[in-house]
Design a protein with these regions (language model features):
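Generic detector of well-ordered alpha-helical packing
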Residues: 108, 149, 167-169
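Hydrophobic residue at the +6 position relative to the catalytic HRD Asp in the kinase catalytic loop
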Residues: 149-156
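Conserved ATP-binding subdomain of kinase catalytic cores across diverse folds
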Residues: 7-113, 137, 141
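Short beta-strand micro-motifs enriched in acidic
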Residues: 94, 157-159
């Protein structure tokens, strides 16, 4: 794929993702291309306090260790195994001496919205929350570590199926404490968005339903 495709100007149509559509907020993300064949272009950016100082540069330690190439390889493996993740289309890095910047292009998943937006529309029943837990277990059973599982990166399609976005710093791991830590991160994110919008349809019982779905799936594995 040509270098110009990694910029908004390299596409006839582009739409910057803003607000609740943004997955985690660390990337500069936009839709590019024409429906029905659209892509998501993401420029890697740092988060947190460091991101205010060094916006999008990373120390170069080898081509295979660049953020974009690592995420591309992980997504390719997961998509090949029919996991509900974006299918990777292209990745690149641009080296400047000791540092580099990176970009990733994935195929856009049609008709998905963030979990935070999905539960803002109306109260979702027990079956839905159990399905979220079951979907998370499917990833954990496959050893998939998601570094930033939150109410934005967990997405829901028009059929109510669960998808995962943003596998930056993700990896494949053996079972361990990281599985519970991932669940804890998602719970904190849901509590946080509830604090931002008290009308959100998320209650303690919903989290218990999610956990029931997760652990029931793990027992039947």
């Amino acid at each position: 794929m040509s270098a110009e495709r990694f910029t908004a100007s390299g596409w006839p149509h582009s739409e910057v993702l803003t607000g609740s559509l943004r997955s985690g907020g660390r990337g500069n993300t936009m839709f590019v291309g024409n429906i029905p064949r659209q892509f998501v272009l993401r420029h890697y950016r740092r988060g947190g306090l460091l991101g205010k100082i060094v916006r999008d540069s990373y120390v170069f330690t080898g081509e295979d260790l660049t953020r974009s190439f690592k995420e591309w390889r992980l997504l390719d493996k997961l998509a090949t195994n029919n996991m509900n993740v974006p299918r990777p289309a292209a990745a690149r890095f641009y080296r400047r001496g000791t540092f580099y910047t990176a970009d990733l292009i994935t195929v856009r998943i049609p008709d998905v919205i963030p979990l935070s937006q999905y539960i803002a529309k109306k109260d979702r029943g027990e079956a839905f929350w159990r399905s979220v837990g079951q979907a998370i277990w499917k990833f954990h059973e496959a050893g998939v570590y998601h570094a930033d599982m939150n109410a934005y990166n967990v997405q829901v399609d028009k059929d109510g199926d669960i998808w995962m976005l943003d596998f930056d710093k993700g990896s494949l791991k053996s079972p361990g404490p990281w599985q519970q830590e991932t669940l804890g991160r998602l719970h904190r994110s849901l509590v946080k968005v509830l604090g931002l919008d008290p009308k959100l349809h998320f209650h303690a019982a919903n989290w218990e339903e999610l956990l029931e779905g997760y652990f029931d799936a793990s027992k039947s594995a």
